Amino acid sequence: MMNSFVVDNSVVMSWCFNDEANKYGDAVLGRLAESTAIVPPIWPLEVVNVLLVAERRNRLKQVDSVRFITLLSQLPIVVEHEGPERQMKDLLSLGRANNLSSYDAAYLDLAMRNDCPIATLDKKLIEAAENVDVTILKF
């Protein structure tokens, strides 16, 4: 995908919580004015899980979660869907080779297949991306 990048949930959720806001996350958000972010099918579930946990811990009110989901729906973030058979085989192999969770492997696999950079704050994912020659989105 031309002018696209993969964004992982560590970056996306930094947009939700004031105490997690950072310059990198803000720069990635700004980049969406001119680019499209792509995410794996697991991404919406990850977002919702973080919001539910935050609500239960009184970090967020329900209205804040709804507001954040509304914001995300207005951004050029595309969920890429793919058949599970290829995905399971490739993610298992990629996760093993790079000591990643299946979730992180899904983001890395997406960047590899689309030949695009990845935006992440996750140190293990950054290291794995560098190991397989995936560019880290930098500013």
Where are these regions (language model features)?
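Alpha-helix capping/helix-boundary segments
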Residues: V11-V12, W43, R86, Y107, ...
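Acidic, PIN/NYN-like endoribonuclease modules and their adjacent C-terminal/linker elements
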Residues: M2-S4, L108-F139
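Active-site-proximal, substrate-binding regions of enzyme catalytic domains
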Residues: V48-V78, M88-D90
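Phosphate- and divalent-cation-binding pockets in alpha/beta enzyme and binding domains
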Residues: Y24, E46, D90, E127-A128
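Short, well-structured N-terminal submotif of metal-dependent ribonuclease cores
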Residues: M1-I42, A54, N58-V66, V132
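Active-site neighborhoods of divalent-metal-dependent phosphate/nucleic-acid chemistry enzymes
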Residues: I77-P117, L121
